């Protein structure tokens, strides 16, 4: 075949691919335009009767924008708007002041210190702030004709849609529970992502959260110059997040984690249903250990040897899985039935949230990377109610690592640094604590390839996993707390001028008779009125007579509460005032 013929054939195929992509993009844009075309006639969402365009414009022009928010500060605020608008030309939201406008909280200039709210769940990040420009409603006469979006909108930012850990932790989980925070929102809302990213590698996962196609900021320009939302919710609940990435202080678990494994597992169940993944029985017909395999970086250099050793030690099949080569639904199917998940530290480990109860997570750390400094997956695995076992293994042998100093800086290369800094990094035995996100020593070490020392890994795993690893049925493990003790009362008796007795009694919390509890104890605090200190007692019975240091003709304050299984502390009953 002549070279010219080959080139012509190649050119035709490339041109056909380009034209096909162009046609698909045009079809997608046309579909979006058709969806909002009705917005020029009928802005009201949901089952309510649809007002005509003139009525919608009148409501906006006369009444203006309406805003009511929950949360006290910009880091925990979610706001509900009526008639919030967005200018595609200015790329800003607009609050129109009319005769029915409400703005709660009405912060004045404090709205800019630093913002009304965070659009993403990464707290107080200066690229994630939301605010709006204020205009009188009369200014609508001089602006482009508004297009009314017919959907209830949930407006937010994705933080890093190309990283699976960020996708789940920062976006999907918070979106899932924010949609359920307000009645009907999960079934009505369309997601509007305003951060400016393209769809990214995991956009199909976002589509699972709502029956309506999510829209990106770039797509809004095809819909009109001025968009107005009859109903919009702005911001995300952060209550499901468990980790901070080190923008202000070195990364680590959040100081006040408010989510448990119960909420994580309910979200995982929803995602599995949407992905059409069944957890009924192992897909391979038997129990197995699953090892994440990577092909570009952070390689396990002796992967085959590792698979064989794990199979021999635990007497079960070992299987590899790869996000690079397999569909995400297939990955979830394998993870959700695995007895053990083994992986080098990386975003793929967030899939541990799909593991069955009783499974084990084994996280491998390259040379010079301290497992105690990087714990997003340990924190996830050890949340109350996740019921997972967690093992961290660290390569302590420099001869078992392969580094890549020649790579680009964002893949761990250090050739761009001066020679002294390169030498320091090469000689370092541990990456010091650091802030996010471009620390060259951290990147150099985390992108190493590792030959796993099999005996030390097996020994490390066996410290945690004593028997055969594997899923197991477990009873409800998230603790149920006692209520208040009931009918607390006290009775005193005086014996002479210097001795007295104080008897305190109470009834069990009313919810105790409906619960199976291994151990019930009671905590009593005894304080002489006017003193700053109290004496605590742990008691097994529902009454007790106190004699030590009880004075006659003295007032005592007494608090009583119930404790289940040593750790589940109930509320104190109302204070008893006891006179001897």
UniProtKB/Swiss-Prot annotation:
It comes from Canis lupus familiaris (Dog). Its EC number is 2.4.1.312. It is an enzyme of class 2 (transferase). Residues 26-580 are lumenal. Glycans are attached at residues 99, 276. Pfam families: Glyco_transf_61. Keywords: Endoplasmic reticulum, Glycoprotein, Glycosyltransferase, Membrane, Signal-anchor, Transferase, Transmembrane, Transmembrane helix. The chain crosses the membrane at residues 5-25. It catalyses: 3-O-(alpha-D-mannosyl)-L-threonyl-[protein] + UDP-N-acetyl-alpha-D-glucosamine = 3-O-(N-acetyl-beta-D-glucosaminyl-(1->4)-alpha-D-mannosyl)-L-threonyl-[protein] + UDP + H(+). One of its GO terms (cellular component) is endoplasmic reticulum. GO terms for biological process: neuron migration; protein O-linked glycosylation; protein O-linked mannosylation. Its main location: endoplasmic reticulum. O-linked mannose beta-1,4-N-acetylglucosaminyltransferase that transfers UDP-N-acetyl-D-glucosamine to the 4-position of the mannose to generate N-acetyl-D-glucosamine-beta-1,4-O-D-mannosylprotein. Involved in the biosynthesis of the phosphorylated O-mannosyl trisaccharide (N-acetylgalactosamine-beta-3-N-acetylglucosamine-beta-4-(phosphate-6-)mannose), a carbohydrate structure present in alpha-dystroglycan (DAG1), which is required for binding laminin G-like domain-containing extracellular proteins with high affinity. It is a single-pass type II membrane protein. This is Protein O-linked-mannose beta-1,4-N-acetylglucosaminyltransferase 2.
